[in-house]
Amino acid sequence: MNIVVLAGGTSTERDISILTSTKVCESLRRNGHNANIIDVFFGIEDKEAESFFTNNNDVEKTAEAMRKNTVNVEDELEARKKSGKGFFGDNVLALCSKADIVFMGLHGSNGEDGKIQAAFELMGIKYTGTDYISSAISKIGRAHV
């Protein structure tokens, strides 16, 4: 299967998401899948996107590059608000659309509140985990406990 492992994001749990997603991606590969990790917020360049499912890159190196981007999250959020670029990084939605399934390795806001799941459902993208309504209700319920 061609699997996108979605990681990173903008929450304070970004680093945990990257760690989790790295381990998941490595495990999926050991089990014969074409899996690759991508940062939902920063995405990847066009040249990398072309070979995304056939490139058996070093997952740990990719994760390290994602961790280095962590210092830029706040600045990038501000820049995107001004430019209207939106949340998803370059090539993220295109690659998720081409995947057989997306593994949701996101933690914290956006990954657990149903927003990304809702976008995926609108686009017909298959993903792991609960649907957007269940995610949203769960997030709201935890806030009141």
PLM region descriptions:
Residues M1-A143:
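ATP-binding N-terminal substructure of ATP-dependent carboxylate-amine bond-forming enzymes
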